Amino acid sequence: MSKIIGIDLGTTNSCVSVLEGGEPKVIPNPEGNRTTPSVVAFKNGERQVGEVAKRQSVTNPNTIISIKSKMGTAEKVTVEDKDYTPQEVSAMILQYLKGYAEDYLGEKVTKAVITVPAYFNDAQRQATKDAGKIAGLEVERIINEPTAAALRYGLDKQDQDQKVLVFDLGGGTFDVSILELGDGVFEVLATAGDNKLGGDDFDDAIIEYLVAEFKKENGIDLSKDKMAMQRLKDAAEKAKKDLSGVTSTQISLPFITAGEAGPLHLEISLTRAKFDEITLPLVNRTVGPVRQALSDAGLSTSEIDQVILVGGSTRIPAVQEAVRKETNKEPHRGVNPDEVVAMGAAVQGGVLTGDVKDVVLLDVTPLSLGIETMGGVFTKLIDRNTTIPTSKSQVFSTAADNQPAVDIHVLQGERSMAADNKTLGRFQLADIPPAPRGVPQIEVTFDIDKNGIVSVKAKDLGTNKEQTIVIQSDSGLSEAEIERMVKDAEANRDADAKRKEEADLRNEADQLVFQVDKTITDLGEQITEDEKKSVEDARDELKKALEAGELEGIKAAKEKLEGVLQPLVMKVYEQAAAAAQARQGGEADAGAGKKDDGVVDADFEEVKDDK
């Protein structure tokens, strides 16, 4: 069975891993780094992903960052007069990860396990699955990030019974999950979180502080300057990382803007104490979900055996201190917070292929599911933290006499009124026979699959007529849209490959032109005028083809020049070989004619003993 890769599709960075010899291994990107920035940029129609896209983000306004925060919404990103859905942009990142995983493995990759924040709703999960499909991946499983982290952590601890709290603060989302580990069973007891809290918010707090300080000093509002804001974003992210290791950092941005008197520079010293002060409200927001998860699991902090920190933002000292204070535990430091989620996804891939045995994963739905009933009330059918996959049915009736149809409004959330919860979808069960209100029996069944994706069925028990939908929110993509995006992605992949082929060909042609000039110089007078003219004409022809930029023309001119150059190159080699041979011969002769004064000539006389 082909390999199933594990992908942590992150807000700020992404990571890909694969199971090798029973152990998950992180696959480095082409730059040699173990995580890849979740950044996509466009320049003159050319697409860039990862490190190269991030490096030029300050100067390129057509750069997309933190697209994960838009997953599950109908919001689109417009770049170079073209609209892209969050699914399409995420697919570009996935396609890049898939590409370098294939290079590493030396085989085609078609299957993946992709992680999502535990608190992702149905629309966000479906969007992630669609992104995988657009990228040419069969998404075998969507699993929650904290669960994946626990899977990696507990892989070699299956003989120990433990209750583990996973605290996952990434670039854009925050989750807390509590799991029970024992005998190869990884059971999620409860999960809680905040999909609008992450490292980006800590960056924004620093940016707000810098903008306010600069305005106070210079009277200029940098927030109106897009280029300055991008530079501030990069500086804030760097300062945040620096303050995890030092107590003070200098933020220096020369020529940040211009005033009446000329260029202005931003020079501000940011201490860890100040950083802690401006980000305190964000740190405090992590406490509620921790308490909620413990309460839902029916556990006290003393019953937690281990606390695992996941996500780059857990390196912030104030966050670590908040975790210690809330759990009365020193967090476990045996896992890399940037890589553990992808590695856990690879372990799940191994479970699916049968390479990892005796591991059972029991995850939960993070939010309650139900429908709107009379009076705008939210009636729950499946409570949050129910183990999935699961199915639940309940019988409802009509609200009016002779009602011909019922509208089923499917919702996800914890509030008591329907309007305060997240709409997942609506559908109608029609052709209900005329009857007084309360008489028809309408059975509504909710199904949640192993990926946490919801389908709903409504059935008239009197007529056995039923209507089923797989929930698709306003932001969801139809099969036709996904198919179109798959074709676009493949076309882009082909275009990228063609661009690479063209770049490689140009480089080879440039190198060949250089080699011609060097060969002529090396041969000196040994090259005839006819040979010289022939090779120079072919070289000039290749130069013209390079200027014209037509691929087939470059290929033909390159092949012609190679044909003319080959005999001359052989002449250079023969000349070098002859010179080397001559040198060796000279050294041998010199050695033969040299007298060795250490040799003594002597006559020997045989002496016989008389006996």
Swiss-Prot record:
Gene3D superfamilies linked: 1.20.1270.10, 3.30.420.40, Actin, Chain A, domain 4 (3.90.640.10), Substrate Binding Domain Of DNAk, Chain A, domain 1 (2.60.34.10)
Bias-annotated ranges (Low complexity): 577-591
GO molecular function: ATP binding; ATP-dependent protein folding chaperone; unfolded protein binding
Compositionally biased tracts (Acidic residues): 599-611
Region of interest (Disordered), residue spans: 577-611
InterPro entries reported for this sequence: ATPase_NBD, Chaperone_DnaK, Heat_shock_70_CS, HSP70_C_sf, HSP70_peptide-bd_sf, Hsp_70_fam
Pfam families registered for this protein in UniProt: HSP70 (PF00012)
CDD domains xref list: ASKHA_NBD_HSP70_DnaK-like (cd10234)
Modified residues (Phosphothreonine): T173
Family: Belongs to the heat shock protein 70 family.
Role: Acts as a chaperone.
Name the record gives this protein: Chaperone protein DnaK
Organism name: Lysinibacillus sphaericus
Lineage: Bacteria, Bacillati, Bacillota, Bacilli, Bacillales
